From Swiss-Prot:
This is tRNA uridine 5-carboxymethylaminomethyl modification enzyme MnmG. GO terms for molecular function: flavin adenine dinucleotide binding. Keywords: Cytoplasm, FAD, Flavoprotein, NAD, tRNA processing. InterPro entries: FAD/NAD-bd_sf, GIDA_C_N, MnmG, MnmG-rel, MnmG-rel_CS, MnmG_C, MnmG_C_subdom, MnmG_C_subdom_sf. Its main location: cytoplasm. GO terms for biological process: tRNA methylation; tRNA wobble uridine modification. The gene is mnmG. Pfam families: GIDA, GIDA_C_1st, SAM_GIDA_C. PROSITE patterns: GIDA_1 (PS01280), GIDA_2 (PS01281). Belongs to the MnmG family. It comes from Wolbachia pipientis subsp. Culex pipiens (strain wPip). NAD-binding protein involved in the addition of a carboxymethylaminomethyl (cmnm) group at the wobble position (U34) of certain tRNAs, forming tRNA-cmnm(5)s(2)U34. Its cofactor is FAD.
Length: 682
């Protein structure tokens, strides 16, 4: 009978991060998966990252996770979403070559120290109770009846728990097309009294590249040079490809409307789908006034003929999918290689978990990924690494918890275990009240030291961080040594407060309209070095919460983050001296120093605003309060608040999907209304 310190069930994005994290901490780890050949499979879209999601990938990488390095070995189209806005909303995203990504993950997993991989299914657990009645894991039981002894299990089942695929009226028990579901394991969880719910998601049809008329489509070129995800990657080596854009039209919508009754969405109304990744059927129904919807045609590989049409996920019958596709510009002759489908599956109530992702019912049992009600590769990876870390650390009675103040992973896990979910959970910057501090550019500076302190992070990664921190300090000290008076600044066309106080170059860099080129004009000794690019024209950080105004103004009304793929680049920024080593990208150092300088005053205000929120938790909300009269609240927020009718701000904060921005907007509205009433009665 075999015995392992940690057993991870499931070889998806959560499982791979959990298994490698536990192994890095020295735990003898077993990864059990249905098929070794599908480890690292990108089941839905062939891309990693995005707004908020890209930050999570960087955070996983900062903890020595594997997703960032794998996507860097597979990236074929890279873009920084929101690149022309403040760094707090930058969203690195990379289109992947599916084969290269899977190959990269498998090469890492199958050659990892302390990690064994086994091809089998887990159907049951051996759970015992101690004298206090506390249940704990003793073993996992496979479908062949084998017992594998372990005291720590991480369950990362994805969409496989009682998974069912729907294509029109046809249904097939499956967790992913071509793969069987985990029926017995779902029954086991039910047997041990875990509260199960049902969710669904979907995927679009895959198209044949050679049957698409590319000449009539809008080309979307990626960033040049492409931006790596991993802090250990110097550059992306794969050839880069373009994506293309087309749109649905009235004919497309008519085809969909006439066949809605044949879609799985018509009989799965009680099974909630992702709000922010809706099917084309949902878009046509919910946004009937829209004449078209955008579709991104994304290549699935450099030498792969498969095209992923992002934006038309559906579960219509195959013949209807053909009719729909052929109504779209450029796709008139397109052939479908694989139909789109919906998949419904079980999830557990994440409120049954601690912040370590250990279950409250069974000691030593951890859940990570879509089983917790989340959606997305990145969210799964973020949970997986935390579950794997804690499974290993708990063997010596230790734990590792990230917080809302230090990471998006911390925001996500706190949301899940305290608020639960009512629909598939997806990360947005609007969910993070400390988003000005937890950005994509500083994940290593936030988390790598924490990982190193628990022996999770390699010496190589830690050395890279130390070199980077040293270079940042050197540059900041250089800038602080250069001073100038407000009077002298006027000769350079810079007008600031005429207070007679000398300003350092670092002070000036914090001003919205002062960049590196302006500093070089003032101080020629900041001479040109090797050419590097710097996002110096990116907009200054937008104002953080203003409690005297109307709440947070820089979040979208629909609760999602705006996507802006434009990035302003200046390739002629200087390097002030040669002490910044060649092994550290000089543009990273300049970027880090400038961002910190520009965000410094806003971070101070952010702290004050968060303190304000904490102090106002007992503020009463009128019973029949009309939330729709508050500008800036999303439809989701209004619906939930009108339904639940929270009595206080503190209760409203605990509702799943209610963002910090929404809470501030409500507080400001109530306070302004109270002030008006007082003024009128005076």
């Amino acid at each position: 009978m075999h015995k392992y310190d940690v057993v991870v069930v499931g070889g998806g994005h959560a499982g791979c991060e959990a298994a490698t994290a536990a192994a890095r901490l020295g735990a003898s780890t077993l990864l059990i998966t249905h098929k070794i050949s599908t480890i690292g499979e990108m089941s839905c879209n062939p891309a990693i990252g995005g707004v908020a999601k890209g930050v999570v990938v960087r955070e996983v990488d900062a903890l020595d996770g594997i997703m960032g390095r794998a996507i860097d070995r597979a990236s074929i189209h890279s873009v920084v979403l929101n690149g022309s806005r403040g760094a707090a909303v930058w969203g690195p995203r990379a289109q992947a070559d599916r084969k290269l990504y899977k190959k990269a993950i498998q090469e890492i997993i199958l050659n990892y120290n302390n990690l064994t991989v086994k091809e089998e299914s887990v159907d049951d657990f051996l759970i015992e109770s101690d004298s206090n009645g506390e249940s704990y894991i003793k073993a996992v039981i496979t479908d062949s009846g084998e017992r594998i002894l372990t005291s720590r299990v991480v369950l990362t089942t994805g969409t496989f728990l009682r998974g069912v695929i729907h294509i029109g009226e046809q249904t097939t028990p499956s967790g992913r097309i071509g793969d069987k579901p985990a029926i017995e394991l779902a029954n086991t969880l039910k047997k041990y009294d875990f509260k199960l719910g049902r969710l669904r998601t979907g995927t679009p049809p895959r198209l044949d590249r050679g049957t698409i008329n590319w000449s009539v489509l809008q080309e979307q070129v990626g960033d040049n040079p492409p931006t790596p995800f991993s802090y250990l990657t110097e550059k992306i080596n794969q050839p880069q490809v373009s994506c293309f854009i087309t749109h649905t039209n009235e004919h497309t919508h008519r085809v969909i409307r006439e066949n809605l009754h044949r879609s799985a969405s018509s009989y799965l109304d009680n099974v909630i789908a992702p709000r922010y990744c809706p099917s084309i059927e949902t878009k046509v129904k919910k946004f009937a006034e829209k004449n078209n919807h955008q579709i991104f045609l994304e290549p699935e590989g450099i030498d792969d003929n498969t095209i992923y049409p992002n934006g038309i996920s559906n579960s219509l019958p195959i013949e209807v999918q053909y009719e729909m596709i052929k109504s779209i510009k450029g796709l008139e002759n397109a052939e479908i290689l694989r139909p789109g489908y919906a998949v419904e599956y079980d999830y557990i109530d994440p409120r049954e978990l601690f912040h370590t992702l250990e279950t409250k019912k069974v000691k030593g049992l951890y859940f990570a990924g879509q089983i917790n009600g989340t959606t997305g590769y990145e969210e799964a990876a973020g949970q997986g690494i935390i579950a794997g870390i804690n499974a290993a650390l708990s063997l010596s009675q230790k734990s590792f918890v990230l917080h809302r103040t230090d990471s998006y992973i911390g925001v996500m896990i706190d949301d899940l275990v305290t608020k639960g979910i009512t629909e598939p959970y997806r990360l947005f910057t609007s969910r993070a009240e400390y988003r000005l501090a937890i950005r994509s550019d500083n994940a290593d500076r936030r988390l790598t030291q924490k990982g190193y302190d628990i022996s999770l992070v390699s010496h190589e990664r830690y050395s890279v961080l130390q070199g980077k921190l040293k270079s940042i300090k050197q540059l900041e000290e250089k800038l602080e040594s250069l001073t100038i008076t407000p009077e002298q600044l006027r000769s350079y066309g810079i007008k600031i407060s005429y207070d007679g106080i000398r300003k350092t170059a670092l002070d000036l860099l914090g001003y919205p309209n002062i960049d590196w080129n302006k500093l070089r004009e003032i101080w020629p000794e900041l001479n040109m070095g090797s050419s590097v690019s710097y996002l110096h024209n990116a907009k200054a950080p937008l104002p953080v919460i203003q409690v005297a105004d109307t709440g947070i103004q820089y979040l979208n009304d629909d609760g999602m983050d705006a996507v802006d793929t434009e990035k302003n680049v200046d390739s002629s920024v200087m390097c002030w001296n040669n002490t910044i080593t060649d092994s550290i990208a000089k543009n990273e150092i300049y970027e880090a120093v400038a961002i910190e300088a520009k965000y410094k005053p806003y971070l101070v205000r952010q702290e004050a605003d968060m303190k304000f929120l904490q102090e106002e938790v007992n503020t009463q909300i009128p019973t029949n309060f009309n939330y729709s009269q508050i500008k800036g609240l999303s439809t989701e927020v209004i619906e939930k608040l009108q339904s639940i009718k929270p009595a206080t701000i503190g209760i409203a904060k605990q509702i799943q999907g209610i963002t910090p921005a929404a809470i501030v907007s409500i507080l400001v509205y109530l306070r302004n209304k109270k002030t008006k009433i007082a003024a009128n009665s005076a």
